[in-house]
Amino acid sequence: MSSTTHHPHVKVIEGMTAAAISGDKDALAKIFTDDMQFHVRGPLPKVGDHDGVDGFTDVIGTIFELTNGDVNIEALLISADDTWATEWEHAVLGRNGQKLDTHNVFAYRFEGDRIAEMWMVCTAPAGSEAFWS
């Protein structure tokens, strides 16, 4: 993984990703503010706005459930300052013998050292919704 900054928020994002993949809700609760908002856009399941750790794990858990865990992600770039961070990610998901190869963009708003708001935008091409059917 490459990063353009060594800001402490980069480590927070890397820790959040590891906790999300392992399903560690306790770690996520320490990383997210109590009222964290998670906004999901693009051809993904559970598109919309979700609240807190439970909302986040519901969305991410659904992706892992529908793919039987066949999720490979690589952070290509993470950049951060004291309030904002961005991430560019390459993801390859497998489901029912099909692959969805996409790039995702994330924007994070921090309050102190915790994530208060997060946007996930999947840039998969039009028609990719069929992957989830």
For the regions a language model picked out, list residue spans one by one:
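Charged, low-complexity, helix/coiled-coil-prone segments
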Residues: 1-9, 44-54, 104-106
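Short, low-complexity N-terminal intrinsically disordered segments enriched in polar/charged residues
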Residues: 1-30, 34
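A beta-strand edge to alpha-helix "cap/lid" segment located at domain peripheries
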Residues: 2-4, 57, 61-133
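Short hydrophobic/aromatic segments of transmembrane alpha-helices and their interfaces
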Residues: 10, 38-39, 99
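Short, mixed-charge, low-aromatic patches
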Residues: 11-20, 43-46, 61-65, 88, ...
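Short glycine-rich loop/turn motifs that provide flexible caps or phosphate-binding loops at active sites
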Residues: 22, 51, 96
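A solvent-exposed, acidic/Ser-Thr-rich amphipathic alpha-helical stretch
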Residues: 25, 29, 33-82
